[in-house]
């Protein structure tokens, strides 16, 4: 089947590679323009652009996928299906009506429509998530679904552990959908939840929340975004790994303290033990190493 692929992020790359290894190898990859990256703010290519060039697939990076030139380039490839995964840009009419578009979305729709479904599933304490293949429509992640597959969220899963499993499922499920062309079923609007983009303030661990809630925030934001503790009169402290210490009740909410060599952060009804931290401007390290070189 002739396909075109729209994708940008690292998540999209794994799906692109699986698609390229199938009978539905894309004739064209459309991704976002290069943008400044890192501390030096040098222009860097999107991961999908790098992967497409490695695979020998033509790459298009238009200012907007909806402009006339981009639409003409996609049409010239004569795709039977346009495959979308983590593209990061709005797809509008008339492009939507010009092609059948299938989106790889890392949640069990209609739960967690939106920009951060993997993070929100971990934060909410969901015991499972998954991948859905849906037809792209104008409304956000609201199109009918033709395939879905569940994946458990393990007790210690971070984003960095869960996302690769969902990438593999997404690639396999997309290829299966292209092979088998299963029927579409509308989503149940009564069960819709939204996965809003992670706001900067959500990175900060709020001591008014329970240790269990904070531990899930740490896992959901590790390693790509990162949780942190804001400290009065000191640089913020990144938190890369933590465990719940409900047995500790004498650490005030918001207080950083030590007990028997453990670094603790007080929260509502208990404490969070910080196992791995990242000082401002430094590298991640075990909490014990941090305590040996830094004063609280």
Stretch-by-stretch model annotation:
Residues 176, 180-231:
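Active-site-lining helix/loop region of Rossmann-like oxidoreductase modules
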Residues 7, 29, 52, 174, ...:
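Residue-level signal for inorganic ion chemistry
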Residues 13, 17-21, 72-75, 93, ...:
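Amphipathic, non-transmembrane alpha-helical secondary structure
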Residues 81-195, 199-200:
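Donor/substrate-binding cores of folate-linked one-carbon enzymes
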Residues 1-39:
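N-terminal Rossmann-like dinucleotide-binding module
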Residues 2-5, 29-30, 38-47, 51-131:
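Active-site-proximal cofactor/substrate-binding loop regions of enzyme domains
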Residues 208-296:
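An anion-binding loop in the catalytic cleft
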């Amino acid at each position: 089947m002739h396909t075109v692929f729209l994708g940008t992020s690292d998540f999209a790359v794994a799906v692109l590679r699986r698609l390229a290894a199938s009978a539905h190898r894309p004739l064209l990859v459309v991704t976002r323009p290069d943008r400044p990256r890192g501390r030096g703010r040098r222009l860097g290519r999107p991961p999908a652009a790098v992967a497409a060039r490695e695979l020998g697939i033509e790459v298009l990076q238009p200012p907007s996928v909806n402009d006339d030139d981009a639409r003409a380039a996609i049409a010239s490839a004569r795709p039977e299906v346009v495959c979308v995964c983590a593209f990061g840009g709005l797809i509008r009419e008339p492009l939507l009506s010009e092609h059948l578009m299938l989106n790889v979305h890392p949640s069990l729709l209609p739960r967690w429509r939106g920009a951060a479904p993997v993070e929100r599933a971990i934060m909410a304490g969901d015991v499972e998530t998954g991948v859905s293949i849906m037809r792209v429509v104008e409304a956000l992640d609201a199109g009918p679904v033709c395939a879905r597959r569940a994946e458990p969220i393990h007790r210690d899963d971070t984003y960095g552990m869960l996302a690769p499993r969902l990438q593999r499922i997404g690639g396999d499920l997309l290829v299966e959908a292209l092979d088998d062309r299963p029927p579409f079923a509308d989503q149940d609007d009564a069960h819709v939840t939204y996965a809003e983009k992670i706001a900067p303030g959500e990175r900060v661990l709020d001591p008014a929340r329970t240790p269990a809630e904070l531990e899930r925030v740490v896992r959901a934001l590790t390693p790509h975004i990162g949780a942190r503790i804001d400290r009065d009169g000191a640089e913020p402290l990144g938190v890369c790994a933590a465990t719940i210490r409900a047995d500790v009740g004498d650490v005030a909410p918001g207080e950083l303290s030590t007990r028997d060599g453990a670094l603790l952060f007080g929260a509502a009804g208990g404490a969070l033990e910080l196992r791995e931290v990242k000082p401002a401007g430094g590298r991640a390290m075990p909490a014990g190493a941090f305590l040996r070189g830094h004063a609280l």
